[in-house]
């Protein structure tokens, strides 16, 4: 069986091959997992190759939204989110799922119930985080992105779709929230005020899971769900979708940390 992660500049940088290879070995499953750099204009071509040769694949930046148009079906959650990070190939049909949303909900959902949540970003990861916050019962959600128009469009779309209080704020704007989620690739700057927050959630794990925002959270005594935690949880859910197994998350996390040299 063949699996992959596709995106921009993932070869040699994504920990997913190491993580899933270690997991497959521990489960006694004969499978290969590779990283494939796929330019946007070749996404359709890869989809046709995957349809005939792969059992499943993961999708990362910048294809989580674009890949949807090449799939045969979506899970209910992926359809609501408008983004896919996990694809199951079965009988030459490709079905999209969103295990990012599952991971955020599982690891942070308890903190988001009745809370004010700030989401940084407006791409595929932000969509997943936004859905998880809504599912958890967040009291109010703020969306903040460097391109203000994208934040406004995302907030409006989800506000109308789910009838929840969701507000876009300027990138330079300051707002304090109970839970802050970084769904951007920014790792080398403090991009939000964590004063008074109870939880910080970080999607970034490379070049290091100790991003500037993680360091700021630790300095302030804010609980952290880091990029490694999210990667492992979404990956475990992906394996459950692909193979119907319950993988050992400790094995997966150990492989990720070894890949990162930690």
Swiss-Prot record:
One of its GO terms (biological process) is amino acid biosynthetic process. It catalyses: shikimate + NADP(+) = 3-dehydroshikimate + NADPH + H(+). Its EC number is 1.1.1.25. Pfam families: SDH_C (PF18317), Shikimate_DH (PF01488), Shikimate_dh_N (PF08501). One of its GO terms (molecular function) is NADP binding. It comes from the Archaea. Involved in the biosynthesis of the chorismate, which leads to the biosynthesis of aromatic amino acids. Catalyzes the reversible NADPH linked reduction of 3-dehydroshikimate (DHSA) to yield shikimate (SA). This is Shikimate dehydrogenase (NADP(+)).
């Amino acid at each position: 069986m063949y699996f992959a992660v596709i995106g921009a500049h993932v070869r040699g940088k994504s920990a997913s091959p190491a993580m899933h290879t270690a997991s497959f070995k521990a489960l006694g499953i004969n499978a290969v997992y590779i990283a494939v750099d796929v330019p946007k204009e070749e996404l359709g071509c890869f989809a046709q190759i995957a349809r005939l040769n792969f059992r499943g694949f993961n999708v990362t930046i910048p294809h989580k939204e674009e890949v949807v148009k090449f799939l045969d079906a979506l899970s209910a959650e992926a359809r609501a989110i408008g983004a896919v990070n996990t694809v199951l190939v079965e009988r030459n049909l490709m079905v999209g799922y969103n295990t990012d949303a599952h991971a955020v909900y599982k690891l942070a959902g308890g903190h988001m119930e009745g809370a004010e949540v700030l989401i940084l970003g407006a791409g595929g990861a932000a969509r997943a985080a936004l859905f998880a916050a809504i599912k958890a019962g967040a009291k109010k959600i703020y969306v903040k992105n460097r391109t203000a128009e994208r934040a406004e469009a995302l907030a409006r779309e989800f506000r109308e779709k789910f009838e929840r209080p969701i507000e876009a704020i300027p990138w330079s704007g300051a707002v304090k929230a109970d839970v802050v989620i970084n769904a951007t690739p920014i790792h080398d700057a403090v991009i939000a005020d964590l004063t008074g927050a109870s939880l910080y959630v970080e999607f970034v794990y490379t070049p290091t899971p100790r991003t500037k925002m993680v360091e700021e959270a630790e300095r302030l005594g804010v609980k952290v769900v880091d990029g490694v935690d999210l990667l492992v949880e979404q990956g475990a859910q992906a394996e459950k979708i692909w193979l119907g197994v319950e993988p050992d998350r400790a094995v997966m996390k150990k492989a990720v940390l070894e890949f990162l040299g930690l």
